Regions:
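Sec-dependent N-terminal signal peptides
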Residues: 1-8
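C-terminal motif of bacterial Sec signal peptides marking the signal peptidase cleavage site
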Residues: 11-15
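Short, glycine-/small- and polar/acidic-enriched structural segments
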Residues: 23-163, 168-171, 187-193, 209-210
Length: 330
């Protein structure tokens, strides 16, 4: 399976790498994946001075691939990197000593279909609409990746069998995905607000409208945990806690309506869209961003969204860094 393969690679790489964990007060190398909104709060924390205010010396490092973050955190080439449960959990199971420091963002994805597709039901309730795409081809970033799991989960909750009733097609990142959709190479596509400037509402029909909304299969999704190795946490406790405090500061900043323009600016920078598109994307996504807290319940809730079949949930107490994720440490 794709997810398992990337995680095995990450764990294997953990045997080598630099000793980034060793020096308290030295540069913290933090992974930031460009082109997607996951690491927005990290970008804001650096560029709006929240890391500086907490005395954290940070260098943002964009990895080439999302799965490269897992390898880099485990090997200490990155001090902190955001990892989805589908990569974090298998790494822990295979013996990697890493801990989740907090939460970043929930679901940022909707599902759309070609113009003219008959969609029955309410897009805010996927249980009523997903059956309308039975028999369709669905474009996802890559086969076996998290996006396929999440759409499959919505299909299952709507009474479908994803293995039989829908066909997934890997179409890549937004630019190539949109091109494939416009060329009608797929019937259905993943969709997020950062894609709006390239694919307007008039060019599709909505299957779902659930970003930042409760009561659906993806309401509890955590799209990324900022994660550090156990050696980093043990050897740089002050740096790690100041990083955590800065991220809590940034979340508070993001939730103040007076800062919407700033959030839109950095959304545009991170995702590579025009400034006005960044502002619109922030407005659409702001409810999806999460405080750093991780609860045992929310941790266990990731299981059906982390693999198929659902993986074993790692022990919460030993896999989550409670001083940061247990509540506001400031």
């Amino acid at each position: 399976m794709f997810i398992a393969a990337t995680t095995v690679a990450a764990f294997t790489l953990g045997a080598c790498g630099s000793d980034a964990a060793s020096a308290e007060g030295s540069v913290m190398r933090i992974g930031v994946t460009q082109g997607v909104p996951t690491d927005l709060l990290t970008v804001v924390a650096e560029n709006e001075g929240f890391f500086d205010k907490r005395g954290v010396n940070v260098e943002l490092n964009p990895p080439a691939l999302t799965n490269a973050v897992a390898a880099a955190v485990i090997s200490n080439d990155l001090t902190v990197g955001s990892m989805v449960p589908a990569m974090l959990w298998p790494a822990i199971e295979k013996g990697a000593c890493v801990k989740a420091l907090g939460s970043l963002v929930g679901n940022t994805m909707d599902v759309i279909a070609q113009p003219g597709t008959e969609i029955a039901g309410d897009p805010a309730d996927p249980d009523t609409t997903m059956a309308s795409i039975k028999g369709k081809t669905i474009g996802v970033t890559a086969r076996g990746a998290g996006m396929e799991l999440w759409i499959s989960q919505m299909a299952q909750e709507a009474g479908m069998d994803p293995a039989k009733d829908i066909t997934f097609v890997g179409v890549g990142a937004p630019a190539t995905a949109i091109a494939a959709f416009k060329a009608k190479q797929v019937d259905v596509l993943y969709y997020g607000p950062t894609m709006a400037s390239q694919l307007s509402e008039s060019e599709f029909v909505r299957v779902t409208d659930i970003i930042g909304k409760p009561g659906n299969a993806l309401s509890g999704l955590n799209h990324g945990y900022p994660t550090a190795s156990c050696s980093t946490i043990a050897e740089r406790p002050n740096d790690v806690m100041n990083y955590c405090k800065a991220m809590w500061d940034t979340y508070d900043f993001s939730q103040d309506p007076q800062n919407a323009a700033v959030m839109g600016k950095w959304m545009a920078e991170l995702t590579g869209v025009a400034p006005e598109a960044g502002t619109a994307a922030w407005e659409a996504l702001k409810e999806a961003y999460l405080p750093m807290t991780i609860t045992k319940e929310s941790w266990e809730e990731q299981a059906p969204l982390a693999g198929s079949p659902a993986p074993t949930v790692p022990d919460f107490a030993s896999s989550v860094y409670e001083p940061c994720a247990g509540g506001d440490p400031r």
